[in-house]
Amino acid sequence: GFGDPYLAFKIGLVGAPALTLAEFMKHKPTFQLYAYGGIYVPIGDYDSDRLLNFGTNRWAYRFGLPMVLPLGDPKRQTNLEIHPGFTFYGDNDDPTGGGGVKEQDELFQVEFHLSTHFNAKWWGSVGGRYRKGGETTTDGAADGNEQDVLGGEVTLGYSFTPHLGLQTTYGDVLTESDGSQSTM
């Protein structure tokens, strides 16, 4: 089956002018701020009798203010990217495992990356993500699963062509107070 489709938009608020290709090639990037919004549409494959589902049987909405701060020499392309945002969830009125209604609190998340190009082919990044909130309740009873976790990652990438590359990432939970465990 298919999962729920996700539709999103991003619009430049500061430092992201509309440019022709020729103007873009000459443009020196400065601080950029965007408005971001997205919606998960609950039309994916879902059956409350199954433990695993591609769909979620609920609407969800994401909003954020991503920003990019170019640092140093534009020829080496070093950027600090910060993407704070919130996700708001609708109710699932037919949750897996029974029960009448599953609700979920809003989830705050901020993701950040410092990336640089070492030369025309090699690039690297360090970053992380903090998540707080998102506890679910089933029929009004708290499920005790609020997220409060900070993860970190390092990435090394190689570009074979401008459109084809390879990257490897290592990530881990740095600190948590919710029992989260993950290594990738």
Positions of the model-derived regions?
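Outer-membrane pore/translocation modules
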Residues: 1-104
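Outer membrane beta-barrel transmembrane domains
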Residues: 92-184
